[in-house]
Regions:
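Conserved functional hotspot residues or short segments at active or partner-binding sites
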Residues: 144
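Conserved catalytic cores of very large enzyme subunits
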Residues: 2-136, 154-174, 178-481
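Long acidic/polar interaction regions in large eukaryotic complex-forming proteins
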Residues: 137-141
Length: 481
């Protein structure tokens, strides 16, 4: 029936539109409505003809990998800003009820760039004769190769697109030999991660990762500082090409962060030409997506600080700053190994993880709005004779709320992410199902600084200086201050 409706729509038979709307499922209507909001003025016809759902009934199996292949082959390819990007937001992988999508993930793009799919197939460990994981990995590799072959065979009159298409599928089987290849390989896999419905996936430490390719190109006379900067500018603009589609809530909240600075594995500070290029690019283009996060420490140079401040002053919101020394020490105290935290990253905006060793999920549960506990305590109208008694009441309220948001979750599988995690391949386990070294679960605590400031103000003005009462505080909240 749907094929006949599509044929009639293509023929511009107007009376079919109301009929088509009645035959579309509720889920499809929801997505069409959402997509029209995201895109602006897009016709029902265009969305109905191009929007397609791929229901993955058996995540983590060979059947799922076959569905990936079908979806990859049907999805369109974007050529914009001088690079190929095979992400089609109108081809949607649909998860069964009860499966929680993987979000807020940062792949290790140093492994992605050096990856060889043939070697992965040869070296993957069989753990039993009927190894579901291995079959699924073989299937996902076939899906990736099929997509690369499709790109290779694309007909294009654009000389640059034709040039890039020639990279495929060869770059899937070796390390990159130029900055241009490295950028294209990152974009290829990044697009597939998005196509797999892994929202909020970051780019990681690109100044550390890309510098070796840039240096080689400069030594060979292939690139200059300015030409490399132009390529990285195109890279950033293309990542933001689908911002509306990649934003599950607020426009621009995509989790597409580029991490700069910080120490490398040997403890040396990373400040190179690529670092400077990204800061200069974001100062010039003034876009909110993607974003920069800068890992700072006591060795961060004054010149870098000045560039960061200049970039921030244009209103783009980048870079955010990470006090890496403090965060790494806290991660070790929490349970991460000291030898791993040098490769600290964030899962989206701020939640720490170890790049290449983590499938930590920091946004799967309902968020806790901390100031709500203070509000509930004040509404009860108890007489608090000391600040400590009020603080204890707020803590007790939080202790009641926290267990209410915790639940057991059945996560989606990611054979695609598993390809680039050595622990997954060695264990024979999927990225989100005990394959990675770390998989901590987190609950978002919203408004912690607000709660702290509120409590400090109450202590000062209510209990210490006796200028106002708790009833005054409650009235201020009720009347929007």
């Amino acid at each position: 029936m749907n094929n006949k409706i599509k044929w009639l729509l293509k023929k511009n038979i107007s009376f079919i539109k109301p009929i088509a709307k009645k035959l579309v499922s509720k889920n499809q209507k929801k997505y069409i409505y959402t997509w029209r909001i995201m895109l602006g003025k897009v016709s029902f016809k265009e969305l109905f003809l191009n929007l397609e759902f791929f229901r993955d009934e058996y995540p983590g199996t060979f059947l799922s990998a076959k569905l990936y292949r079908k979806m990859f082959l049907k999805s369109d390819v974007t050529f914009a800003y001088n690079y190929i990007y095979p992400f089609d937001p109108l081809k949607i992988r649909f998860l069964p009820e009860g499966i929680t999508a993987l979000v807020s993930i940062t792949p290790d793009y140093s492994c992605v760039l050096k990856s060889d799919l043939r070697r992965i197939k040869q070296e993957i460990t069989f753990h039993n004769e009927e190894d579901k994981f291995v079959d699924t990995v073989y299937g996902i590799i076939d899906a990736v190769e099929a997509k690369a072959d499709k790109i290779k065979k694309r007909q294009s009159c654009n000389e640059r697109e034709h040039f890039l298409s020639a990279f495929f599928p060869e770059i899937l089987y070796r390390d990159c030999i130029s900055l241009d290849e490295a950028i294209q390989k990152i974009l290829f896999y990044n697009a597939l991660f998005w196509q797999a419905r892994h929202w909020h996936n970051g780019l990681g430490r690109l100044d550390l990762i890309l510098n070796q390719y840039y240096i080689r190109d400069v030594e060979l006379g292939i690139e200059t500082y300015e030409s490399a900067k132009r390529r990285l500018k195109d890279f950033c603009l293309l990542l933001g090409y689908h911002t509306k589609f990649k934003s599950p809530g607020l426009i621009g909240d995509t989790g597409q962060y580029i991490l700069l600075g910080g120490i490398d594995k040997e403890g040396n500070n990373v400040e190179n030409d690529i670092t400077y290029m990204f800061l200069e690019i974001f100062t010039e283009i003034k876009v909110p997506d993607p974003k920069l996060i800068f890992r700072v420490n006591d060795k961060t140079s004054t010149e870098i600080w000045n560039l960061c401040i200049k970039c921030l002053s244009n209103g783009c919101g980048s870079p955010l700053f990470m006090n890496e020394t403090l965060i790494m020490n806290n991660m070790v105290e929490f349970g991460y190994e000291r030898e791993d935290v040098w490769n600290l990253g964030t899962s989206a905006c701020w939640e720490p993880l170890v790049i290449g060793k983590s499938s930590c999920q920091n946004n799967p549960f309902k968020s806790i709005v901390l100031c709500d506990s203070l509000y509930r305590v004040l509404k009860k109208g108890r007489d608090f004779y000391s600040f400590q008694s009020l603080l204890l009441a707020v803590k007790n309220d939080l202790a009641i709320e926290v267990p209410l948001v915790i639940e057991d979750l059945n996560y989606d599988y990611s054979p695609l992410m598993s390809l680039f995690d050595s622990d997954c391949l060695n264990k024979g386990k999927d990225f989100s199902h005990k394959g990675t070294k770390y998989m901590y679960q987190g609950v978002q605590l919203l408004g912690l600084p607000n709660l702290v400031n509120s409590l400090l103000n109450i202590k000062k003005y209510v209990f210490d200086r006796h200028l106002i009462t708790l009833d005054d505080c409650l009235n201020a909240i009720a009347n929007n201050y």
